[in-house]
């Protein structure tokens, strides 16, 4: 166990949620099952009208390390995450979507990998598409230049609360891609993002569940994030971003355009996506 783990820092697990009580309970249970015991769970209920409020009241009675905040009106994912962070008391913050699951050693392993000079730590993810699962193996170290091609981190990291506060938290003006935007700002100010060499999260990729961020906002958010950061990008990064924007918009991008737009280090990934996904 590292010196950092011997100091036993408190980790705040932040979970925004909206109308997914059954999935939320599963997500919370995966945090309660962590090998790292010094955890608080901060849930922000974004004005759910299902059984979420009752579920949270029951769980808070059963587990003293759970706290919840309820938005009177739906305010979206970014606002809900910021509220959770503001109400957290841990030195470290780790996010979890309400339909995803942490593996039991996630927090312990991420803490063990965190060190000065890095903005955050992520892990490999198991992507659950329902009928099939794919393990997303990420680069051991993800730099700002890597991120300016696309979001190579995914949807969650473990980082210090003070780092998130220093860069201003999640951008509430973005309708989506708020996580991607935050990773860019963290990497810009605090260094690259490290990947723990383990698969520590199961990400629900099913498209039939109501989300706190609607699919209607996905394209708008991606474009807004690109516009916000394109001044940092070189020509190759901009070209690849335009290619991914077309994919996000549902355009049928041919092989020739793919080879013209995709840098060599990303070609295998794009060929695999085009053939099998």
Model regions: which residues?
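N-proximal low-complexity "stem/linker" segments adjacent to membrane-targeting elements
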Residues: 1-32
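Glycine-rich, basic loop-to-helix element that forms the pyrophosphate-binding segment
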Residues: 71-88
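Short aromatic/hydrophobic "clamp" motif used to bind/position activated sugar donors
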Residues: 93
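Acidic helix N-cap motif at the loop->helix transition within catalytic regions
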Residues: 22-25, 50-59, 101, 105
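A conserved acidic beta->alpha catalytic loop
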Residues: 30, 37, 45-54, 73, ...
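Conserved nucleotide-sugar donor-binding catalytic segment
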Residues: 140-225
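C-terminal subregions of glycosyltransferases and related glycan-biosynthesis enzymes
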Residues: 2-6, 181, 188, 199-277
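Conserved donor NDP-sugar-binding/catalytic core segment of glycosyltransferases
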Residues: 105-135
